[in-house]
A protein has these predicted regions:
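Transmembrane alpha-helices of Major Facilitator/SLC transporters
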Residues: 49-53, 242-263
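Juxtamembrane intracellular "pre-TM" segments in multi-pass secondary transporters
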Residues: 1-3, 180-211
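Helix-loop boundary and gating motifs at the non-cytosolic
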Residues: 1-49, 205-244
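Helix-to-loop junctions at the C-terminal end of transmembrane segments
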Residues: 55-66, 153, 254-267
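Cytoplasmic helix-loop-helix junction between adjacent transmembrane helices
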Residues: 99-138
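Conserved MFS/SLC helix-loop-helix module at the cytosolic interface between two early adjacent transmembrane helices
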Residues: 53-86
Length: 355
């Protein structure tokens, strides 16, 4: 089982590294392919939709047909996505590529979290440790992506970067085929029925999502908030990738400790969540009032600490909702609820935050 844990985490690291690298050059690469800004923008929104909103189906399919099968399908769709993406001279191929990117990432990510719960057994400490490791490797890969991309952009070899990402996904897919068959032994297949939604999505489940959606949604808006701060306000766009690197580095440093220490109950979120919300919003306006490169980075530190706390708190709370059967559905439903909240908050940020 230790081998399977490492395999899942290694696959998550390299696949996310490739995914973030691809996203970083997404706009530039497709512009050079001759696609219009509106076509690129819509395809990117389709990617995010497939990646988030379909998570609940990814979870249900994982519970019904097997976590391993859905993760392998996700790996295969990632490979297929790069084939379409490299051939994306036509808009239809681009839409196929982004759909495969979003759904592939969704299938693997949702069911990998559920699989780690199954591997961990019944011990809460082991479950939270593995969920913390999953978040940590995700942060490490997002931190490494900007560093990987810089030389490819500088020397105008973006096409080579996409081919490198494609090669990573092909190698990962081939390496995963045999080991993933062992995962089936740790899971009991469950056929989903809509009548069971009430048993799974309890009042406490909905309550913690309602309480934590503000800090989590604002944290997801990192790629809007900090480019605005460093580019529009300070006129220093070169600091945006540095901020992303610092954010990833701090996340990696904090993640293990937070995973061990944070053990909130649903009732405790009633007073912790408002503190997190105020803590991530109020310093933003103080930063704008006392604007400088130093206050910007101070806010980045505050932002990251609250982001990691909120993400870890939610991950550990989901572990408590684990009923031993509908693990895929639990993570899928959580991802869907947070994606809907994030859409609402992100549409308000330009009017309330970016002033």
């Amino acid at each position: 089982m230790l081998y399977l844990q490492k395999l899942l985490l290694i696959r998550r690291f390299f696949s996310t590294l490739a995914f973030f690298s691809m996203q970083t050059v997404f706009f530039i690469y497709l512009q050079k392919k001759g696609l219009s800004n509106s076509e690129i923008a819509f395809s990117l929104s389709l990617l995010f939709f497939c990646n988030q909103a379909l998570a609940i189906f990814a979870g249900v399919w994982g519970d019904r047909f097997g976590l391993a099968k859905m993760m392998l399908l996700g790996c295969f769709l990632d490979v297929l996505a790069y084939i379409f993406f490299l051939s994306a001279d036509h808009y239809f191929l681009l839409l196929l590529a982004t759909t495969c990117f979003g759904l592939g990432s969704c299938l693997f990510g949702t069911n990998a979290k559920a699989c780690l719960l199954a591997i961990a057994g019944d011990e809460y400490a082991e479950k939270t440790r593995l969920q913390g490791k999953y978040l940590k490797v995700t942060s490490m890969s997002s931190m490494g992506a900007p560093l990987l991309v810089i030389p490819f952009i500088k020397y105008d070899h973006i096409n080579a970067l996409i081919w490198a990402c494609f090669a990573i996904e092909v190698i990962l897919f081939v390496l995963m085929i045999k080991p993933f068959s062992q995962i089936q032994a740790v899971q009991k297949l469950v056929k989903f029925r809509f009548s069971q939604i009430r048993d799974i999505m309890t009042k406490d489940f909905l309550f913690v999502h309602l309480m934590l959606f503000i800090p989590l949604s604002i944290a997801t808006s990192f790629f809007v908030i900090f480019p605005f701060l460093f580019d529009n306000k300070l006129g220093m766009p070169e600091h945006s990738p540095i901020a992303l690197f610092v954010n990833g580095l701090l996340t990696v440093l904090l993640q293990s400790t937070f995973s061990r220490k944070i053990n909130l109950t649903p009732k405790q979120t009633a007073w912790v969540a408002p503190i997190l919300a105020v803590g991530i919003v109020a310093p933003w306006f103080l930063t704008l009032h006392y604007l400088s490169i130093y206050t910007a980075y101070l806010y980045l530190v505050i932002f990251t600490v609250i982001e990691v706390y909120a993400l870890t708190a939610m991950a550990n709370l989901l572990v408590k909702f684990d009923n031993g059967t509908h693990r895929g559905f639990i993570f899928g439903a959580s991802r869907l609820l947070l994606s809907l909240a994030t859409v609402g908050v992100m549409n308000l940020i330009p009017h309330l935050f970016l002033v």
